[in-house]
Amino acid sequence: MNDWMKGAARATAPLLLTSLFGAATACHSPGAYGHAIMYAPLADETRATQGAKEFDPVMSRRRPEDYRKTAFFGIVVARSPGAAGLSNLTISLRTREQRNICANRNDEDTCRVTVSDTEFGGVHAIITVKPEDDVGELAMAPGSLVRVVAEYKGDSDASDGLPTVRGIYYRHFPRHYYRTRADAAVLRQ
C-alpha cells in the first residue's frame, strides 16, 4: 500500500465508523410492542387505519354513519367467548399519549406505548383472537392494551348499553408491555 492510499484510509476511517454507527443505531426497530420514544404503528396497522375515524362514544351514537370504520386504544376489562370462535372484549377506552414513557431516556428499548390513566368511555369489540394471543403468559386478557380497528353499525349491547363494534384488525400489548400516564411520576429521570 503506497503512502497516498494509507493517508486516504486514515482520513476516511472515522467517516466510515461514524456511518456504520449511524446506520446501526438508525435501524432500531420498535418491534411488535412499540419500544420507541414515539408511537410506531406496524405496516398492517397503518393499512388497516386508512380511512378510519378515532372512536368517540358520544358522537358515534349521534352520527353512527361517520364511524362506520373506526379505531381506538383501550384496556381490556373482560374477555368472553363469542359465537363461531370469536371473542367478545369489553374495553375501557383510553387516549394514546403523543410520547411514550421510557425508563431510560437514552435507551428506546425501555420505552412503552403509553395511554391515559382514565377512560373516556367503553365499548364491546367482537374480534378473532390470533393463536399467539389466545393462551399463555402473553395472552389477551383483562389488563391488556389493544389498538382496534373496527366496523361500527350503531349497535349497542343489550346488557350494558355500550356500543358494539366488529374488529377487522387489532394490535395487542400484554400487561406490563405498555404504560399509563401515571407511570411518568414513578419513572421520572
Where do the protein language model's features map onto the residues?
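Bacterial N-terminal signal peptides that target proteins for export
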Residues: 2-16
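Intrinsic-disorder/low-complexity regions
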Residues: 1-2, 55
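OB-fold and OB-like single-stranded nucleic-acid-recognition modules
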Residues: 27-189
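C-terminal motif of bacterial Sec signal peptides marking the signal peptidase cleavage site
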Residues: 22-26
